[in-house]
From Swiss-Prot:
Organismal lineage: Eukaryota, Rhodophyta, Bangiophyceae, Bangiales, Bangiaceae
Chief localization: plastid
Glutaredoxin domain sequence ranges: 6-107
Lineage: superkingdom: Eukaryota
CDD domains: GRX_PICOT_like
Protein name: Uncharacterized monothiol glutaredoxin ycf64
Originating organism: Porphyra purpurea
């Protein structure tokens, strides 16, 4: 990962409490997993930032390196990597994702 790409990722994570690196946008997810992630986040009724990795190949590869996770989408809460769509769904079904967001908003 080059220094400039690392800086971009760090800036995105620094400037946003909840970040979803995904394929496509909130309004037009470009894969089923990104769509699942968006649906989960929309259910939480909170603000979140999305980054379309299809717009930048360097970010697309670097975010996988940054998280040591091979797939997209990737959710970060308070700079911490949470997981992809399956982990998000599992945490959501257990009420843990909502709890993480509520803790973040209460801080």
């Amino acid at each position: 990962m080059d220094i400039e790409t690392k800086k971009v990722i760090e800036q995105i994570l620094d400037n946003n409490k909840i970040v979803l690196f995904m394929k496509g946008s909130k309004l037009m997810p470009m894969c089923g997993f990104s769509n699942t992630a968006i649906q989960i986040l929309n259910t939480l009724n909170t603000d979140y930032f999305t980054y379309d990795i299809l717009e930048n190949e360097n970010i697309r590869q670097a975010i996988k390196e940054h998280s040591s996770w091979p797939t997209i989408p990737q959710l970060y809460i308070n700079r911490e990597f949470v997981g992809g769509a399956d982990i998000m769904l599992e945490l959501f079904e257990q009420g843990e994702l909502q709890a993480q967001v509520e803790t973040l908003l209460a801080a």
